[in-house]
Regions:
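Accessory terminal helices/loops
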Residues: 1-2, 184, 191-204, 208-293
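Conserved beta-strand hairpin/beta-sheet module of binuclear metal-dependent hydrolase folds
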Residues: 1-60, 149-165
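Core dinuclear metal-dependent hydrolase active-site scaffold
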Residues: 2-6, 17, 124-158, 198
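Active-site environment of divalent metal-dependent phosphoester hydrolases
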Residues: 11, 35-36, 69-74, 95-99, ...
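Divalent metal-coordination and catalytic microenvironments
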Residues: 18, 30, 68, 80, ...
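Active-site neighborhood of phospho(di)ester-bond hydrolases with catalytic His/Asp-centered motifs
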Residues: 29, 61-69, 88-92, 138-141, ...
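Active-site HxH/HxHxD metal-binding segment of metal-dependent hydrolases
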Residues: 33-133, 157-161, 231
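A contiguous binding-surface segment within folded domains or other stable secondary-structure elements
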Residues: 151-214
């Protein structure tokens, strides 16, 4: 098992490429589509970097995995699928998110049965990538549909585990994901994080985002479970649930909405597909007013 991480500095999002070296098959986790909201311009620099890597290594893409419907960047999953193949994977509870935002955006024709995605996962779902086993973990809290993916590699004789955690836990000096989106829950997030922290201390957690403190360190893509248990500023080992929930809810009240939440969510709940062109050939995003506090 090899994992290569690509950072989009604009949204501070990591796209990870999981590779089974024996079979040369791979999966891409949380791919980013570049979007300039002021100009209404999309571009593919991040996606092309990942595509170029996959091609240069002679890899076959099996899966494009979304850990959840992101609110901070648009997904490039359809673009990558068109270039490399692969199936788009999402947690089955995305249907709840679709139903909520279909109303907010007043989308008449948005299917809310998650049928836009190729593979739907739930707790315990298994994906096979060569000699690697990918197990889905339902980790609600940030949204009701969040999934983490635990990868197990037994090919070297000793079991090796890595987990793509999505928006659950961040670097130790950053803490945890917000829970104030529709159907988010600090109580659920605490329970989800405890499941991750119950893994062996040497398990590598692959982060979806990193937000280094100003004037501090470089971005990091991975953290060991043991380090999280010792140092996470929100939820280190021994943090009571009530204390975490109180902190998380109070902190969320101070946070502004992500700057790309409205463009991102309407695209990402539709498996990354952009709106269809109108009769003038132009695609348009919708911006509902006063719908998110």
């Amino acid at each position: 098992m090899n994992i290569h991480s690509f950072l989009d500095k604009d949204t501070e999002t990591f796209t990870h490429v999981l590779v089974d070296e024996a079979s040369k098959h791979c999966a891409i986790i949380d791919p980013v589509l570049d979007f300039d909201p002021a100009a209404g311009k999309i571009s593919y620099d991040n996606a092309n970097n990942v595509i170029g890597f996959v091609k240069s290594q002679g890899l076959t893409l099996d899966y494009i995995i979304e850990t959840h419907a992101h609110a901070d960047h648009l997904s490039s999953a359809p673009y990558i699928k068109a270039q490399l193949g692969g199936k788009i994977v999402m947690g089955k509870y995305i249907d709840k998110v679709q139903k909520t935002f279909k109303t907010i955006f007043n989308f008449d024709d948005l299917a809310t049965d998650a049928s836009q995605f190729d593979i739907l996962t739930e707790e315990g779902s298994e994906l096979t990538l060569g000699d690697l086993s990918i197990t889905a973990m339902h980790v609600p809290g940030h949204t009701p549909a969040d999934m983490a993916y635990k990868v197990t590699d037994k090919s070297a004789g000793k079991e090796k585990i890595a987990v793509f955690v999505g928006d659950t836990i961040f670097a130790p000096d950053v803490g945890s994901a917000r829970c104030d989106f529709p159907h988010g829950s600090a109580e659920d997030l605490y329970d989800s994080i405890q499941r991750l922290l119950a893994l062996p201390d040497d398990t590598l957690l692959y982060l979806c985002h990193d937000y280094p403190p100003k004037g501090g360190r470089e971005h990091i893509a991975t953290v060991h479970v043991g380090e999280q248990k010792l140092r996470n500023i929100h939820v280190k080992q021994g943090t009571p649930k009530a204390e975490f929930v109180r902190m998380r809810n109070q902190r969320d009240k101070t946070l502004a909405m992500p700057r790309l939440i409205l463009p991102s969510v309407q695209v990402n709940i539709n498996a990354g597909e952009l709106p269809k062109p109108e009769d003038n050939g132009v695609r348009y995003l919708k911006i509902p007013l006063n719908q998110l506090s």
